[in-house]
Swiss-Prot record:
InterPro entries recorded: YciB
Membrane topology: Multi-pass membrane protein
Protein family membership: Belongs to the YciB family.
Gene: yciB
Main location (coarse class): membrane
Protein name: Inner membrane-spanning protein YciB
Residues passing through the membrane, by range: 12-32, 53-73, 78-98, 115-135, 153-173, 175-195
HAMAP family: YciB
Length: 210
């Protein structure tokens, strides 16, 4: 391999496309659940999946696979968090369709968020601020900043896991689907924005970060 080839930069996904890839499958899930009967009447093959939540689950799996495929084709890499989330979607989605039991897809956010929270907080026990490995390309922080941010995100992921359990066990399926899209995302965005003071306080310039 030549030096020029070795130095060839990776293709970066634009922020807008990244947002579409992350939110697209969720929007498909919401639309398919709310319009499941209409989709089943227009596309008989979908009717074989079952009721609206099962049609939504099948299309959610397909949209997730498409999002991962687009990400891979553009960057030749798959971000760790979307990859783990995608694997859980495929496993729990398949169980949902196979057993015709929507409990599995409802538990997917609980499993994913608990896993992320446990990994982040567990890494701190070994002196590793794992969040830095995920977001190091986005911004540079000192060690204390990464540690604090890792703690906050770890706790936040566990909070989302508990919140999902409360919602799906206490409310209807339609409410849970709507909250998954219109509740969880705004909460996550607000939490992310709330971390900006910490990020600015512990930011280091590129020269000091080397």
């Amino acid at each position: 391999m030549s030096t020029v080839e070795a130095a060839k930069p990776k293709t970066e996904v634009s922020p807008l496309l990244k947002l579409v890839l992350e939110l697209g499958p969720l929007m498909v899930f919401f639309f398919a659940n709310s319009r499941g009967e209409w989709l089943a009447s227009r596309f008989p093959v979908l009717a074989d999946l079952g009721g609206p939540i099962f049609i939504a689950t099948g299309l959610f799996m397909a949209a997730t696979a498409a999002a991962l495929a687009v990400s891979w084709m553009m960057t030749r890499t798959l971000p760790m968090m979307p990859l783990i989330s995608g694997i859980v979607v495929f496993v729990f989605g398949a169980l949902t369709l196979w057993l015709q039991n929507d409990t599995f897809i409802k538990m997917k956010p609980t499993i994913v968020n608990t896993l992320f929270g446990a990994i982040l907080l567990g890494g701190l026990l070994f002196g590793k601020s794992l969040l830095g490995y995920v977001f190091h390309a986005a911004f540079k922080l000192d060690e204390e900043g990464w540690r604090k941010l890792t703690v906050r995100w770890g706790v936040f992921f566990l909070f989302l896991a508990v919140l999902n359990e409360v919602i799906w066990r206490s409310f209807s399926t339609d409410f849970w689907v709507a909250f998954k899209v219109w509740g969880t995302m705004p909460i996550t965005i607000l939490f992310t924005l709330a971390q900006m003071p910490l990020i600015m306080k512990h930011s280091v310039d590129q020269e000091n970060a080397k």
